Every structure is written in structure tokens, then in C-alpha cells.
Amino acid sequence: ASLAFTQMEAPGSPVIYGGFTSNVDMKTGAPAFGTPEMAKTTLIGGQLARRYGLPYRASNVNACNTVDTQAGYESMMALWPTIMSHCNFVKHAAGWLEGGLCASFEKVIVDVELLQMMSAFMDELSFSED
């Protein structure tokens, strides 16, 4: 709807398509990120963006309270579909903790490492004789 409103107000304005998806932990009511459901909706969002001919935005989010193994797992579950959906812009790319309530320098380092691995994964393979 915001894309339509933007075009009504300023026709031809550049826009980027994206959504915020989170399922909820039924015990606590807290948002749960880095889940299979979030990964699937990220992929679906990328497909819709391509269908509409728009650039796509996704996020590297998690709900962990500290920088630990779970934080890494949740970030990978957010980053893989972000990369696989051919995302043009990664929002909340590094440092996000506790569902966005805080950021961490340590998590920034972990996330930058993960982003570098994703970038290297996307490099073309060389089959030259060198």
C-alpha cells in the first residue's frame, strides 16, 4: 500500500519493495526471527519484487539476547534467504540483537564475517587453467 501511496503523491518516485516478517513465540509473545517461516517469506518477497519489477529489501535480524551460537544460527537463517532472493539492499545488516532493541559491537563483527562469507559465496567460479 505504501508503494501505491508514494506513486499517487509523487508519480515516478523510486521505491524499494520489502516487508517486515516475524512470527511470534507463543509462550512469551516475543517476535521470533531467524526461523524457517521468516526465511520462506523472505524468499516469497523476493519473488514478488521480481514480478513487480522492483528492487528488493530484506533484513539480517535475530531475537537473541547475547552474541552466542544461536545468534549466529539465526543470522544465517536470515542471510541465506536474503541472498537467495537476490536482495538489492540488506537492512539491519550488522549488529542487531534482541529483536532490534539493542546493537552490539561484537555482533557487528560476527555479522560482517557472515556477510563477507555470503559475498564470497556469490563470486563467480573460475574455471581457467591458471
Functional labels for PLM-detected ranges:
Residues 1-111:
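Glycine-rich anion/phosphate-binding loop at the beta-strand->alpha-helix junction
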Residues 106-130:
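Catalytic-core signal marking the mid-to-C-terminal active-site face
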